[in-house]
Amino acid sequence: MDRKDLDVTLYLVTDSSYHTEESLLRTVEEACKGGVTLVQLREKNKGGREYLDKAFKVKEITDRYNVPLIIDDRVDVALACDAAGVHVGASDIPVAVARKLMGPDKIVGATAKTVEAAVKAYEDGADYLGVGAIYPTTTKVVTILTKVSTLKDICEAVPIPAVAIGGLNAGNMDVLEGAGMSGMAVVSAIMKAEDPKKNAR
């Protein structure tokens, strides 16, 4: 896909801790049917070969629904499975390095908790930003919460899309009203849902 056409409205981040491989793939498919616009495969505890194997399986599903697949952390896995892009966090390789390795046509996303980090990521070639955690999250044991006012400041500081992440669901997303973000990233709201397709809608 053309990275200029990136749609981050509803951004699903996977979490294998809730699933067997079979149920994770089923959940991703149901979420794609429900309307997620981007899927990020996150496998913190898998080695390269296992990660790549799962990436190919997830990409087969996302391709079927024309949903771009983003690989968390691993540029090598993203390139090997020809994913749409990669997402790098603050402790991963620098955005500028990810951009150089991925080339000009792939998507590079970055995590930003401050305006300074957001501006730096943008200048280094990021296509979008993940900002948060807005609320406490079950995916990270220790997390520093990001104020909605900071999210708003980031949205005003850079011209690329910003996605709010962290403990968000249909019941609490009203706090984001007026922040100016382009989309919302969810993990447990879909990955733990009895009906992922319905929750994605």
Write out the residue ranges for each language-model feature.
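Conserved N-terminal beta1-alpha1 strand-loop-helix module at the mouth
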Residues: 1-93, 100-127, 146, 153, ...
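Mid-sequence acidic-hydrophobic segments that form the walls
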Residues: 132, 157
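Internal alpha/beta core interface subdomains
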Residues: 179-183
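A short acidic, helix-capping loop that chelates divalent metal ions and anchors anionic groups
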Residues: 41, 78, 135-141
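A short, polar/charged loop-to-alpha-helix boundary motif
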Residues: 93-94, 137
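Glycine-rich beta-strand-to-loop/alpha-helix junction loops that act as flexible
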Residues: 131, 163-168, 184-188
